[in-house]
UniProtKB/Swiss-Prot annotation:
Gene Ontology biological process terms in this record: phospholipid biosynthetic process
Listed name of the protein: Glycerol-3-phosphate acyltransferase
PANTHER family: GLYCEROL-3-PHOSPHATE ACYLTRANSFERASE-RELATED (PTHR30309:SF0), INNER MEMBRANE PROTEIN YGIH (PTHR30309)
Lineage, opening ranks: Bacteria, Bacillati, Mycoplasmatota, Mollicutes, Acholeplasmatales
Known function: Catalyzes the transfer of an acyl group from acyl-phosphate (acyl-PO(4)) to glycerol-3-phosphate (G3P) to form lysophosphatidic acid (LPA). This enzyme utilizes acyl-phosphate as fatty acyl donor, but not acyl-CoA or acyl-ACP.
Catalysed reactions listed for this entry: an acyl phosphate + sn-glycerol 3-phosphate = a 1-acyl-sn-glycero-3-phosphate + phosphate
Keywords recorded for this protein, A-Z: Cell membrane, Lipid biosynthesis, Lipid metabolism, Membrane, Phospholipid biosynthesis, Phospholipid metabolism, Transferase, Transmembrane, Transmembrane helix
Length: 225
């Protein structure tokens, strides 16, 4: 069975994921509430649009770290599994609990306890989780997002496509530095797939606007007057 430490880390990782980075930075730097302007989202894209590119990067890095750090603690610290369980628990249940803690910051970001259980789309946070599992896939996902974003100008489309690409790579690449056994691998596939479904659902309004041709488009080339 789980120890008291499991519940401690459960609350800690959820609270960390829930921390509204964009909301705090917007209010501290420019006294703007990202929930009320632009796309009304507290993520890095809306922060870039409203606060400027520099602050958008800052929001991305903080949200990225919210996913990266807890996942590293769960997957890379050899004694972590023993810490959160009492002896006698089946290894498969241990793997399920570990994988749940790994993705918890993603759902914390989407359903923030500090924002009436509302939140962002968790792209940066999920990339942080993926990078902890497999740094190569995480960095490749970021590169793919950046290139597609520059090419098409739609952050939402680039986010969805990069998320799907990362999922496919995780599935087809069998070895991941952050995963210690096959059972944990399979369980993580399930949880990552579940979080991807929520990410796409969070983008439902963007998908509708893309279909209608009304989605906000970034322009990286300034027009000459």
């Amino acid at each position: 069975m789980v120890s008291i430490y499991f519940f401690f880390f459960f609350l800690l990782f959820y609270a960390l994921g829930s921390f509204p980075t964009g909301l705090i930075i917007g209010k501290l730097t420019q006294k703007k509430d990202l929930r009320l302007v632009g796309s009304r989202n507290v993520g890095a894209t809306n922060a870039s649009r409203i606060l400027g590119f520099k602050w958008g990067i800052v929001v991305f890095l903080f949200d990225f770290a919210k996913g990266l750090v807890p996942a590293i603690i769960c997957l890379r610290f050899k004694n972590f599994k023993d810490l959160i369980f009492i002896n006698g628990c089946d290894n498969r249940y241990k793997d399920i609990a570990i994988c749940l803690l790994v993705i918890l910051p993603i759902f914390g970001h989407m359903f923030s306890i500090f924002n009436k259980f509302k939140g962002g789309k968790a792209i940066a946070t999920s990339v942080g989780v993926i990078t902890a599992i497999n740094p190569f896939i995480g960095l490749l996902g970021i590169l793919f997002f950046v290139l597609l974003f520059i090419f098409v100008g739609y952050a939402s489309l680039a986010s969805i496509m990069a998320t799907l690409l990362v999922d496919l790579l995780l599935f087809f690449i069998n070895h991941h530095p952050g995963i210690t056994n096959i059972s944990q691998n399979q369980i993580l596939y399930f949880f990552i797939g579940l979080s991807t479904c929520f990410i796409i659902l969070k983008h439902h309004s963007n998908i509708i606007r893309l279909w209608q041709g009304k989605e906000y488009k970034f322009s990286f080339i300034k027009k000459r007057k």
